[in-house]
């Protein structure tokens, strides 16, 4: 972040950790497929610097490769993180998406089902979207971005 935010005009006043944390409401991170795994890990490690997250076609692998086989354990970790770091009050939003024809859809669907079964993950903080007929491809990614970015930066949540 310091390399980009130090060169371009952003909402951070400077590149100190304090300034980057203070400007977290103006920062999002998203990734597709293995980038989705990266997005979940960004949520786990960098919630102080980023408010909005867009994992597309993938689940959290906090507990090792193919973390989708440890769905409950990963969601337990995320839920505890939200509670311990007071993220409900500080603000966070996850737009999790996958296509109904995506070859890795079970990872996302299983994780979403577990998250949505818990009262911690309300629609104010977590949305799961399935693109009808969507595949593991750029067309799906474009739709996910089109839908998520206004929710992130449309004014009400910022």
List each model region and its residues.
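Non-catalytic cap/lid and distal C-terminal segments of serine-dependent acyl enzymes
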Residues: 1-158
């Amino acid at each position: 972040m310091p390399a980009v935010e130090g060169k371009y005009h952003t909402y951070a006043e400077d590149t100190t950790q304090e300034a980057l944390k203070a400007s977290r409401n103006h920062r999002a991170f998203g990734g597709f497929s293995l980038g989705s795994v990266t997005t979940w890990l960004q949520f786990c490690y960098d919630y102080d610097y980023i408010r909005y997250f867009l994992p597309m076609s993938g689940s959290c692998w906090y507990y090792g490769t193919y973390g989708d086989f440890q769905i409950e354990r990963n969601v337990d970790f995320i839920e505890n993180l939200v509670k311990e770091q007071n993220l409900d009050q500080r603000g966070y939003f996850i737009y999790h998406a996958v296509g109904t024809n995506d070859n890795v859809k079970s990872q996302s669907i299983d994780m979403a089902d577990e998250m949505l079964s818990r009262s911690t993950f309300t629609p104010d903080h977590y949305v799961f979207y399935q693109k009808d007929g969507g595949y593991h491809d750029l067309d799906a990614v474009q739709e996910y971005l089109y839908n998520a970015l206004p929710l992130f930066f449309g004014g009400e949540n910022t």
